[in-house]
């Protein structure tokens, strides 16, 4: 079964997530949202990285979609979580750095997302913060 992933926030953490997950056979990136960049900008940032160098896949764009190896990934530029359709995602990677409260994160779950992975600490009761290799058992 393929796990469908959406990424909200395509800064450093969002792009590193994409680089890591793109080649996994059981994972498909199906949605990217970043208010700061259109599909053309995101494709350029995906291709060139000052630390990791050029990505081994070709990332281009067609309209509002990033195209990687012929596969189109819709890109939106919405500020509010509710303005992006996350309903087809099994998991959303919340990498914007802005959505860090339980109330704001629940907007994803209301759209049918099964899990949300936040790339920043959530400093609120009742939210599990897991650091791989430290408290992931």
What would you call each of these model-derived segments?
Residues 1-137:
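N-terminal Rossmann-like NAD(P) cofactor-binding subdomain of oxidoreductases
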């Amino acid at each position: 079964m393929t796990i469908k992933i959406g990424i909200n926030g395509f800064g450093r953490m969002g792009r590193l997530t994409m680089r890591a997950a793109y080649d996994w056979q059981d994972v498909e990136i199906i949605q990217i949202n970043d208010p700061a960049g259109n599909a053309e900008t995101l494709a350029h940032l995906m291709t060139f990285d000052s630390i990791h160098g050029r990505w081994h896949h070709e990332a281009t764009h067609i309209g509002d979609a990033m195209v990687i190896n012929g596969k189109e990934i819709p890109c939106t530029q919405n500020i509010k979580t509710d303005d992006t359709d996350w309903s087809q995602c099994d998991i959303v990677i919340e990498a914007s750095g802005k959505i860090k409260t339980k109330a704001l994160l629940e907007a994803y779950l209301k759209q049918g997302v099964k899990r949300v992975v936040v790339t920043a600490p959530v400093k609120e009761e009742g939210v599990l913060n897991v650091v791989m290799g430290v408290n992931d058992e």
